[in-house]
A protein has these predicted regions:
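A cross-kingdom marker for long, charged
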Residues: 276-307
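Short helix/strand-bridging catalytic loops that position acidic/His residues to coordinate divalent metals
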Residues: 184-190, 220-232
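Surface-exposed patches in mature extracellular/periplasmic domains of secreted proteins
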Residues: 88-95, 151-156, 176-180, 253-256, ...
Length: 307
């Protein structure tokens, strides 16, 4: 589920207490349903006080042995299975051949590979792309609509509840609002990237797994075409794709590409045809679209250079 998120996060203390209570129910109590928390009243964080500091904590993946309740454990495991096998498990909601773990490596438990560790503790969160405060359900559905080129889950559904159960499990013990060492992707110096050079990188480093035309194979997902992520996905941004590629590709030699090679091949991949995203022009309605967003938005009338 990749997208450069704003550093401004909602610190809404009643919701923070609700998160703590929900996590206690989820991890520590006897079998109980964790009620979905829906609060759409707050859509503008400009009137809320900024915290004095944002706490940063160490990366830690919890053990399933910490879950005392068998019903909760079953929910966590089912959520993880949905994220591993998204296309086959949720075919009505997935419009391509990707799984959530195509991008979120090792079930979202790896540092600097867009992990889900601690993510539940960072929601609700103000996101500039929507110019509103989003719940974690909203963020998950954003990925279904964009990265999976599909349709959103019903927020109160069992599927959504189990996915959130897994993410909440990975966030157990993290303070509300805490930043986690190792969240997101590796930092690399932004470059324009060259698609001609990128084609060479793709041919020599990527094609063996992803296919001659980026169509994907049994061992690697499609990178463009109708079975890949759409233009509204975070990975459709060259900077995001380059950071992911730099850190984790090729999988038999992660980190072996230079920053320039990563940007070149990201530029090449994202210059190829892919599905459109209806409503993309409504992204970043208050402005501030990142420079590598390759489509026009209301806040920015001219698109970034796509090739």
């Amino acid at each position: 589920m990749p997208e450069e998120r704003t550093n401004t996060m909602l610190r809404h203390y009643p919701r923070a207490l609700a998160f703590t209570a929900a996590l206690v129910l989820l991890i520590g109590c006897r079998a109980q349903k964790v009620e979905m928390i829906r609060d759409t009243a707050v859509t503008d964080v400009s009137t809320l006080p900024e915290p004095a500091h944002v706490r940063r904590v160490a990366f830690r993946v919890p053990s399933e042995s910490e879950i005392a309740d068998s019903t909760v454990l079953a929910s966590v495991r089912r959520g993880r299975a949905l994220l591993r096998n998204t296309k086959d498990s949720l075919p009505r909601h997935v419009g391509n051949k990707l799984q959530c773990v195509s991008c979120h490596q090792a079930d979202g438990t790896t540092r600097l590979a867009m992990p889900w560790v601690g993510v539940y503790a960072r929601f609700p969160q103000y996101r500039s792309r929507a110019a509103s405060t989003q719940l974690i359900e909203d963020r998950i559905n954003d990925c279904f609509k964009r990265s999976m080129n599909g349709t959103p889950l019903v927020p109160e559904s069992r599927d959504m509840r189990d996915i959130i159960a897994y993410m909440a499990f990975l966030s157990s013990g993290y303070p509300v609002g805490a930043e986690v060492d190792g969240q997101g992707l590796p930092r690399i110096t932004p470059q324009q990237g060259d698609s001609t050079r990128g084609r060479t990188v793709f041919t020599t480093k990527c094609m063996v797994c992803h296919g001659t035309n980026g169509q994907g194979t049994d061992v690697a997902p499609p990178l463009w075409g109708r079975d890949s992520y759409n233009i509204g996905a975070g990975m459709a941004r060259v900077r995001t794709a380059a950071a992911f590629i730099k850190g984790w590709m090729p999988q038999n030699a992660p980190g072996s590409l230079s920053d320039t090679e990563a940007f070149d091949v990201a530029r090449y991949i994202n210059s190829q045809p892919r599905p459109d995203f209806r409503g993309k022009e409504r992204d970043w309605p208050k402005g501030g679209a990142p420079p590598d967003v390759a489509y026009r938005t209301r806040g920015r009338p001219s698109a970034a250079r796509a090739k």
